[in-house]
Amino acid sequence: MEALVYTFLLIGTLGIIFFAIFFREPPRLPVKGKK
């Protein structure tokens, strides 16, 4: 069960860092087909 907790914490940390960078620097990719 400990492995599950560590995996959850790891994914949570990576997710927070990813969203922090994403909202700080919006991607300059041309979005097509998005409503």
Curated annotation (Swiss-Prot):
Location(s), subcellular: Plastid, Chloroplast thylakoid membrane
GO BP, one annotated term: photosynthesis
InterPro entries tied to this protein: PSII_PsbT (IPR001743), PSII_PsbT_sf (IPR037268)
Superkingdom field: Eukaryota
Alphabetized Pfam families for the sequence: PsbT
Membrane topology: Single-pass membrane protein
Main location group: plastid
Annotated transmembrane regions: 3-23
Residue stretches in coiled coil: none
GO CC entries: chloroplast thylakoid membrane; photosystem II reaction center
Keyword annotations: Chloroplast, Membrane, Photosynthesis, Photosystem II, Plastid, Thylakoid, Transmembrane, Transmembrane helix
Family: Belongs to the PsbT family.
The protein's assembly and partners: PSII is composed of 1 copy each of membrane proteins PsbA, PsbB, PsbC, PsbD, PsbE, PsbF, PsbH, PsbI, PsbJ, PsbK, PsbL, PsbM, PsbT, PsbY, PsbZ, Psb30/Ycf12, at least 3 peripheral proteins of the oxygen-evolving complex and a large number of cofactors. It forms dimeric complexes.
PANTHER family reported in the protein's UniProt record: PHOTOSYSTEM II REACTION CENTER PROTEIN T, PTHR36411
Name of this protein: Photosystem II reaction center protein T
Organism of provenance: Coleochaete orbicularis (Charophycean green alga)
Gene: psbT
